[in-house]
A protein has these predicted regions:
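Eukaryotic, compositionally biased intrinsically disordered regions
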Residues: 595-607
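Soluble C-terminal extramembrane regulatory/interaction domains of multi-pass membrane proteins
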Residues: 207-596
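Transmembrane alpha-helix detector for multi-pass membrane proteins
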Residues: 72-86, 101-175, 195-207
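Membrane-anchoring hydrophobic segments
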Residues: 2-3, 8-119
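Hydrophobic alpha-helical transmembrane segments
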Residues: 63-66, 157, 187
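Hydrophobic alpha-helical transmembrane segments and immediately flanking/interface helices
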Residues: 131-143, 147, 178-198, 255-281
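Secondary-structure capping and boundary motifs in well-ordered enzyme cores
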Residues: 117, 154, 191-195, 346, ...
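Canonical alpha-helical transmembrane segment with a positive-inside/aromatic-interface signature
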Residues: 147, 151, 172-245
C-alpha cells in the first residue's frame, strides 16, 4: 500500500479537476495533514468536498466595491464641507453625531429602507442559486443539489444573509417612542453593507462551484475518501462507506450518460476519466481495507450490477476482492453501449481507460483486476461486432493489444529487477512473472477467437486487424525474450485457420501479410528457425499470390497512414532492414526467386 502522504501528494496529477479545488480533495482530514500526523486515519471517513474559492476571489471584489463606495462618500462629504454654511454645522464631528445619535423618526426611516433591501438581497441570492443549481442538477446529476447545500461556504453565506435580515427586522420592531436602538441601527447598516458587498463574490462562488470538472472532481474525492483504509471504530461502518463509494461511482456514471444524451463530449470524457482515476487510486489502497469491506452486502446484492449474477459469480468477486472494480467496469459497459449510438469517441476513451485500469493492476500484481479488464475488453469487442461497428472495433483492438504488450514488458521487468536478489526470491519472482505473462497469451487467444467471429459476420477487415495485432504482440514478446512468445506465435499462426474462405483454399491476404512481416522481423534479428516456422505455415499458398504480396510489401515506403486514425501507421510497412530480409524469406518457396518479382498492376499499393 502506498504511504498516505504520497497519495495526497500525487492526487493533483490523478484527479481531473482544477487546481483551486484540489486543496480540499485529499485522502485525510485537513488538520491532520497539516500536522503530518499519521493518526489522521483514525477518524471517520468524512466528506472531503468542502469546496473553497481562493481568498482573492472574495476579497478583490469586496474591497474594490467598498473602496469605491468609501471614496464617493468621502468626496461627497468633502464637497459638503467646501460648500456648507460658515456656521460649522458641516463637520466630521457632526457626521459622527448624526450616525450615532439618531432620533426615533430617523431610525424608523433608516430601518424601513434597510429591511426592504435586506429582504431583496436574501431573495435574490436564494432565487439565483436555486435556479442555477436546479439547472445544473438537471444537466448533470441530482446529487449536485445535496453537494451544494452541504458546502460550508454556501451555508455560511446564506446563513449570514438570513441572520442579517432577521436582525434588521428585530431592530425595526424594537423601536419605540422611548427607546431608540442607536447601535442596532448602526449594526443594521453595517450588515446591509456587508450583504451587498458579498453578493457578487457569492454569485462567482456559485458559478465556479457548479463547474463540471470541479463537480466531477468533488464527487470522485468524496468516493475515494470512503475507500481509504482507516483505523478505529469508524472502520467498522463498512456499509456506510460502501454506500458512499457506490453513490460516487453511480453519480459519475449519471453525469456521463446525461452528457452523452446532450452530445457534450467534454463532460462525458471528464466523468469517464474520473471513474478510471477512482479505480486506479482505490486499487493502490484496497489491500489495507478490512476483510468485511470486500463482502457484498444484501442491499448491494440487489443493485442492477449484481442482482443478475449467480451466487458463484458473487462469491468469486468477494474472494477476489474485485466487487468495486466490477461495479466501475459495469458502468463503463453501460456508457459504452450508449456511446455506440451517441458519441463513438467516448467508446474509444472507455477502451483507453480500461487499458489503464488493467495496466495499473498488473503493476501492483492484482491479477484478478487485470482479468476483469480483459473480460470487459472481450465484452466491448462482442458489442462492436454485434453492431457491425468496424471503426470502433478497430480502435478497441489497438488498446487491447497495448494491454497485452504492457503485460509482457512488465513480466520481463520483474525478472530483470530480481537478478540482484537471492535465489529463492528469484524463483518466486519468475513464477509471478510467468503467471502475469500468461495473461498476454490469453489476450492473443481471445483475439484469435474474435477474428473468427468477425470473419463469419463478414467483417473481414477486423479479422485482418486482429492478425496484425497478434503479430505485433508476438514481436514484442520476442524482443522481450518472454517465455510466452512461443505460445503466442502458435496462436498467431493459427489465425489463418479461422479466416479461410469457404473452399478452404484461400486465406485472407491481410493475415498472410502480417505473418510475412513478423517473419522478416525474426530474420533481421537472426532467428532463422522462427522465420522458417512461419514459412512452413504458408507452404500451400499460391506462388502468384505470394509474389503479389512480396511486391506490395517491397514497394510500400510510407510508414504514416494517409488517413486520420488512432494508430497512425500502415499495417504493412517494413523497415529497410525488413525489406532486405524479404528475399531470404521467399527463397524458402521453390520457384519464387527475387528475379521473378514483376510489377503487377492489379496490386493496389499504399502510399
Amino acid at each position: 500500500m502506498e504511504p498516505r502522504d504520497k497519495l495526497a501528494a500525487d492526487l493533483a496529477d490523478d484527479l481531473p479537476v482544477a487546481a483551486s479545488s484540489l486543496m480540499a480533495m485529499t485522502l485525510a482530514p485537513e488538520g491532520d495533514r497539516m500536522r503530518g500526523d499519521e493518526s489522521g486515519t483514525d477518524g471517520p471517513p468524512r466528506m472531503v468536498g468542502q469546496y473553497k474559492l481562493p481568498l482573492r476571489t472574495w476579497s478583490v471584489p469586496v474591497l474594490a466595491i467598498l473602496g469605491l463606495a468609501v471614496v464617493i462618500f468621502v468626496l461627497a462629504f468633502w464637497l459638503n464641507v467646501l460648500t456648507g454654511d460658515s456656521d460649522g454645522t458641516t463637520s466630521a464631528d457632526n457626521l459622527v453625531h448624526a450616525l450615532l445619535y439618531q432620533d426615533v423618526d430617523q431610525a424608523r426611516n433608516t430601518l424601513g429602507g434597510l429591511g426592504e433591501v435586506m429582504a431583496a438581497v436574501l431573495g435574490l441570492a436564494l432565487t439565483v442559486s436555486s435556479i442555477i443549481v436546479q439547472l445544473a442538477a438537471t444537466r448533470f446529476t441530482p446529487h449536485i443539489t445535496s453537494l451544494f447545500f452541504r458546502a460550508r461556504t454556501n451555508l455560511l453565506v446564506l446563513g449570514f444573509f438570513v441572520t442579517a435580515t432577521v436582525f434588521v427586522v428585530w431592530v425595526n420592531f424594537s423601536i419605540g417612542d422611548n427607546y431608540v436602538p442607536r447601535w442596532g441601527v448602526l449594526f443594521s447598516m453595517l450588515l446591509m453593507t456587508a450583504s451587498l458587498l458579498l453578493l457578487f463574490p457569492y454569485f462567482a462562488y456559485v458559478f465556479d462551484f457548479l463547474d463540471p470538472e470541479k463537480i466531477v472532481g468533488r464527487i470522485t474525492a468524496n468516493g475515494l475518501y470512503a475507500c481509504t483504509p482507516i483505523r478505529g471504530k469508524a472502520a467498522q461502518a463498512v456499509d456506510e462507506r460502501q454506500l458512499q463509494a457506490i453513490e460516487a461511482v453511480e453519480h459519475l456514471t449519471n453525469i456521463g450518460l446525461n452528457a452523452l444524451q446532450q452530445k457534450d463530449k467534454n463532460i462525458a470524457s471528464s466523468a469517464i476519466e474520473a471513474l478510471c482515476k477512482f479505480a486506479v487510486l482505490y486499487g493502490e489502497t484496497k489491500a489495507g481495507m478490512l476483510k468485511e469491506w470486500h463482502r457484498i452486502a444484501p442491499w448491494n446484492r440487489r443493485s442492477p450490477d449484481f442482482v443478475s449474477l449467480s451466487h458463484e459469480a458473487v462469491g468469486d468477486l468477494r474472494e477476489r476482492c474485485t466487487w468495486l472494480e466490477w461495479k466501475i467496469l459495469r458502468q463503463y459497459q453501460m456508457v459504452f453501449t450508449e456511446g455506440l449510438t451517441q458519441i463513438k469517441d467516448v467508446c474509444y476513451l472507455i477502451a483507453i481507460d480500461t487499458r489503464r485500469l488493467g495496466e495499473a493492476a498488473a503493476k501492483r500484481g492484482d491479477l484478478h483486476t487485470l482479468d476483469l479488464s480483459i473480460k470487459f475488453f472481450n465484452t466491448y469487442l462482442r458489442a462492436t461486432i454485434n453492431a457491425n461497428d468496424i471503426r470502433t472495433a478497430y480502435n478497441i483492438l489497438h488498446q487491447y493489444r497495448q494491454l497485452g504488450e504492457m503485460v509482457v514488458n512488465e513480466g520481463r521487468s520483474m525478472v530483470r529487477k530480481a537478478r540482484s536478489k537471492s535465489e529463492r526470491e528469484q524463483r518466486e519472482v519468475l513464477e509471478r512473472a510467468k503467471t502475469l505473462e500468461r495473461r498476454a497469451v490469453d489476450v492473443a487467444r481471445f483475439m484469435r477467437y474474435y477474428s473468427s467471429v468477425a470473419f463469419k459476420r463478414g467483417m473481414v477487415f477486423i479479422a485482418e486487424v486482429i492478425a496484425h495485432d497478434i503479430g505485433t504482440l508476438c514481436a514484442v514478446a520476442f524482443h522481450a525474450e518472454s517465455r510466452c512468445h512461443d505460445e503466442i506465435l502458435r496462436i498467431f499462426l493459427a489465425v489463418d485457420d479461422a479466416t479461410e474462405s469457404a473452399d478452404k483454399e484461400k486465406t485472407l491476404r491481410g493475415v498472410r501479410l502480417a505473418q510475412i512481416k513478423l517473419a522478416t522481423d525474426y530474420l533481421v534479428h537472426g532467428s532463422v528457425a522462427l522465420a522458417k516456422q512461419v514459412a512452413d505455415d504458408m507452404k500451400a499458398e499460391d506462388h502468384k499470390r505470394l509474389r503479389s504480396m512480396w511486391q506490395e510489401l517491397d514497394k510500400l515506403d510510407t510508414r504514416e497512414f494517409w488517413e486520420v486514425n488512432d494508430r497512425g501507421s500502415n499495417f504493412d510497412y517494413l523497415t529497410p532492414e525488413q525489406k532486405t530480409a524479404l528475399a531470404h524469406f521467399f527463397a524458402w518457396f521453390p520457384g519464387l526467386g527475387y528475379e521473378q518479382v514483376e510489377d503487377d498492376p492489379s496490386v493496389v499499393l499504399r502510399p
